[in-house]
Amino acid sequence: MTWLYVTLGVIFGLILLCLITSLVCFFIVFYSPKRKTLGPDEYEIPPGKIYEPYRDYMISWARKARAMPHEDITITSYDGLTLFGRYVEQTKGAPIEILFHGYRGYGERDLSGAIDRCFSIGRNALIVDQRASGKSEGNVITFGAKEKYDCVAWANYVAQRFGPEQEIILCGVSMGGATVTMASSMELPENVVCTLADCPYSTASGIIKKIIKDLKLPVWLLFPFVKLGARIFGGFKLEDASPLEAVKNCKVPIIFIHGDSDDFIPHQMSDELYEACPSLKKIVKIEGAGHGLAFPTNKEKYYGALLDFEKQWRAYKEQKNAT
């Protein structure tokens, strides 16, 4: 019987090792601890050397956004989390952009500059803290698997509050771009007229594998534990965070914008999404722009792309309403 006990001990040990490794991977990749509260004169910019040249701009945008008249809004997610957003209005009745930030970011830090962009082209802005980020509740980042439902909930909130004539544009950067891309294939209110996906990834699995590879770690060894950690400890499947699958059923016009010098999320991922999308679409590459920096790198081209595509989706909307 000794061999049986040894065998069972080995099996139990392997299972325990797998669970511990998966738990470690879960905490590294998906877990978001309690966020610190910034003081009235404290501001942050995203980590990384590529953002240092834009530090003054980003802090200026955040300071300006904090001082603007605004309304703090909360909604409840489908699984009971309180989600936070900040609404800033320049022109009553103007289109509202609902903006979603990226991985481990939060609205004020990552999206304050988008307020000026929105105002410059006649739009109001609702800046959202995604689940497990900023002032929103939750501790698990799901790479869009659950965030896509939050996006739909925000769109429904705006539609119900502002009425059937209120135009809504879904906008996201990085993971936020992936989130709005996935939401664009779901049941959205008729108010949603367009989606802007800035530097999205095509699949959560793909971008996680890419990062593991960039760290010179064995993808074949670590990724299964990342995937298992998401399932066991995060309560979601990575396969449910696939913009590439979702975009095949995209129901609204969508514009993809990506910096061609993005070394975090390759711009080819936007190409994949563009090719798979059946709806009215446009793709724009910003030369020399790093990750999430397409707008500050070339504002003129960014504005031009948005305004050109607005003409297209308005014509599409008129044609659709006429039929």
Annotate each PLM feature.
Residues 141-162:
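Alpha/beta-hydrolase active-site loop
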Residues 118-137:
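Conserved alpha/beta-hydrolase
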Residues 249-251, 256-258, 262:
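Short beta-strand/loop motif that positions the catalytic acidic residue
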Residues 103-117, 130:
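The serine-hydrolase catalytic nucleophile loop
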Residues 289-303:
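Catalytic histidine-centered segment of alpha/beta-hydrolase-like enzymes
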Residues 12-76:
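An N-terminal hydrophobic leader/cap segment in hydrolases
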Residues 263-269:
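Conserved alpha/beta-hydrolase "acid-adjacent" motif
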